[in-house]
């Protein structure tokens, strides 16, 4: 380790491209690349004559199309591209043919695939019916809760009116007994 001022340089700072530069305040300039035999095999590639024959120049507006030199810019400016997404949804209805249970399905030792399919279809239909019934009952319950809240509000109003009537009757009785 070496000390420069109050900063210490360790091996990692010396190996770092920035650590020693910060500490010493000097900037190291990298050496230029030397052409070796390995690098000489990488020669620049001359472009193809086909690529150099066609030059593409941009037109003035960013919405215009790039055109070749031999094409007129006047025609290019009038060209328009319309982009749009087109999606089609195909609904395929496959009629469900429920298999029939035969005597062999009922009398076999193990349940057959046909029997299990029929039972699964029946269970699915029962489940769908129960889900519909459940939705109806939830809607009815919501309506009943709303009616119950309205009845509670009406009851509170009636109780307040009765309390006011009782207070008026008591004050009338007190006034009537006070006058006698």
Swiss-Prot record:
Keyword Secreted set for record: no
Compositional bias (Polar residues): 1-27
UniProt-annotated stretches for the region Disordered: 1-29
Coiled coil: none
Phenotype upon loss of function: RNAi-mediated knockdown results in sterility in 20% of animals. Sterile animals have severe oogenesis defects and partially differentiated germ cells accumulate in the proximal arm of the gonad. Furthermore, germ nuclei in the distal region of the gonad are enlarged, and their nucleoli are misshapen. Sterile animals also have mitotic defects whereby pairs of chromosome bridge, which is indicative of a defect in coordination between endoreduplication and the nuclear division cycle.
GO biological process, one term: negative regulation of DNA replication
GO cellular component, one term: cytoplasm
SUBUNIT field: Homodimer. Interacts with cdt-1; the interaction most likely inhibits the ability of cdt-1 to load the mini-chromosome maintenance (MCM) complex onto DNA and therefore reduces DNA replication licensing activity. Interacts with nob-1 and ceh-32.
Family statement drawn from the similarity comment of this UniProt entry: Belongs to the geminin family.
Protein's name in the database: Geminin homolog
Organism, as annotated: Caenorhabditis elegans
Classification lineage: Eukaryota, Metazoa, Ecdysozoa, Nematoda, Chromadorea
